């Protein structure tokens, strides 16, 4: 199988892009390694954010580890469930975790449920925990999406855009080669290539953009859960458009409707209005607080002008004990007493 990947419009040609490598006789898929690297960097960022917020870093580390394990299993189950037409004929392939076959939405769903249960048990706020965790999750997603590059996955329809990606037709599953791709096959050095949109790249850049947005907003959030809901709405918005372009998508059984397309639309439709409404309400509350504070300060200034403080009045002279002794008459030496004594 030809192992090259080309971006001719960008002047990039990778003659050898392996799917895996070996160390001491053990084979590791690059897809899995990149997901692991993204997860580790994401968890590192989460623990740093927890420390910045004065939270227990160990609690967040425990939560992320549990959620990660559950999300990996959940993403695989989700993928198998919506690809059952293939797996029911290949049951042994269900446990083949090395060659991809994971659904991100399944991982997010199961991972967030695990985090919610963890917060319930530890009696901590799920919304605050999610706010702290979601930038790290986005960082992990941005890195992990490059695993699709090495697996020749997550690509779109034929395109002649300058950043189009060329993949040997022999390197992808036959069911993912559309009629438009076959009509526009390119033969280079005797090798047939399909020319497609790099959806994995779009999503990686989108996740990076959302990551930067949340990092900029984390000091300015108005309420617990705001960053988390922006993450859900923002990711849903981007993923909705990417799913329209994507070829290798998961469909709702018996339909031609992509399950990720539906989930993305729901996330955006539900959480974006909530984000906007709660942000407007929070700003109104802040405005009311500022007005009340200004009114209080203005009234305080007015009272000072009408009723000056005692400290600003001229102080009365202090009568010291020695002054009392000087003023007080000497009874024993008074003239009246002298006459009586005489």
Predicted regions and their residues:
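A feature for loop-to-transmembrane-helix boundaries and adjacent hydrophobic helices
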Residues: 1-342
């Amino acid at each position: 199988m030809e192992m090259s990947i080309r971006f001719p419009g960008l002047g990039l040609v990778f003659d050898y892009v392996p799917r895996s490598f070996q160390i001491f006789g053990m084979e590791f898929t690059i897809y899995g390694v990149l997901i692991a690297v993204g997860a580790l960097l994401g968890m590192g960022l989460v623990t740093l954010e927890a420390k910045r917020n004065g939270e227990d870093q160990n609690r967040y580390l425990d939560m992320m580890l549990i959620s990660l394990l559950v999300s990996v299993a959940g993403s695989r189950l989700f993928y198998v469930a919506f690809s059952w037409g293939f797996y029911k004929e290949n049951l042994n392939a269900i446990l083949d975790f090395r060659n991809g076959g994971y659904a991100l939405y399944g991982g997010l769903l199961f991972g967030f449920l695990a985090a919610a249960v963890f917060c319930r048990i530890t009696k901590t706020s799920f919304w605050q925990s999610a706010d702290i965790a979601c930038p790290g999750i986005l960082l992990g997603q941005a890195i992990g999406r490059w695993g699709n590059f090495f697996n020749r996955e997550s690509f779109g329809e034929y395109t002649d855009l300058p950043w189009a990606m060329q993949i040997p037709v022999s390197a992808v599953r036959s069911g993912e080669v559309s009629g438009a791709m076959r009509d526009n096959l390119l033969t280079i050095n005797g090798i047939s290539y399909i020319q497609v949109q790099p959806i994995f790249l779009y999503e990686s850049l989108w996740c990076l953009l959302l990551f930067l947005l949340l990092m900029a907003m984390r000091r300015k959030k108005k309420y617990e859960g705001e960053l988390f809901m922006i993450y859900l709405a923002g990711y849903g918005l981007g993923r909705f458009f990417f799913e329209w372009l994507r070829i290798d998508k998961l469909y709702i059984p018996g339909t031609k409707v992509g399950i990720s397309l539906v989930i993305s639309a729901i996330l955006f439709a539900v959480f974006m209005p909530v984000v906007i409404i709660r942000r407007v309400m929070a700003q109104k509350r802040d405005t009311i607080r500022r007005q009340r504070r200004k009114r209080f300060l203005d009234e305080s200034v007015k009272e000072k002008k009408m009723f000056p403080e005692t400290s600003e009045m001229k102080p009365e002279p202090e009568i010291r004990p020695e002054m009392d002794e000087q003023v007080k008459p000497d009874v024993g030496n008074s003239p009246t007493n002298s006459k009586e004594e005489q």
